[in-house]
């Protein structure tokens, strides 16, 4: 079974649990770090996720994973908040964080640059749109973008 297939199965398992608590399932990752595998489930809610929220979701999902056993080897389960500088992946993320400062990293340089910062204007027709320097609009084809994340300045 591939990583992608495991992530899809776990997403199907996690969605009802997360929705039951009125949280948002932000992402599911199944990755290998060193010699260990990690199943990471990121959840969020307006106002932010607490440790207690993570614990409740972790326990419920762990019980289901133990019964259904969709992962053929050992792993560590982690449930957490995606953090303030969370990557934006879904169309709903782009809508939710419209008007906020974001960083866009592209795979190949555009005019010699791979990182762009600006106000998120939106997501339309598979393009991410930001406003740089107050009013200069830039559009990025989604498949040419490696990462979009919020920029948090203190």
Curated annotation (Swiss-Prot):
Gene3D superfamilies: Ribosome maturation factor RimP, C-terminal domain, RimP-like superfamily, N-terminal. This is Ribosome maturation factor RimP. The keyword Cytoplasm applies. Required for maturation of 30S ribosomal subunits. GO terms for cellular component: cytosol. It comes from Acetivibrio thermocellus (strain ATCC 27405 / DSM 1237 / JCM 9322 / NBRC 103400 / NCIMB 10682 / NRRL B-4536 / VPI 7372) (Clostridium thermocellum). PANTHER family: RIBOSOME MATURATION FACTOR RIMP (PTHR33867:SF1). It is found in: Cytoplasm. Keywords: Cytoplasm, Ribosome biogenesis. NCBIfam families: PRK00092.1-2 (NF000928). It comes from the Bacteria. The keyword Cytoplasm applies. HAMAP family: RimP (MF_01077). It holds the Pfam family RimP_N. One of its GO terms (biological process) is ribosomal small subunit assembly. Belongs to the RimP family.
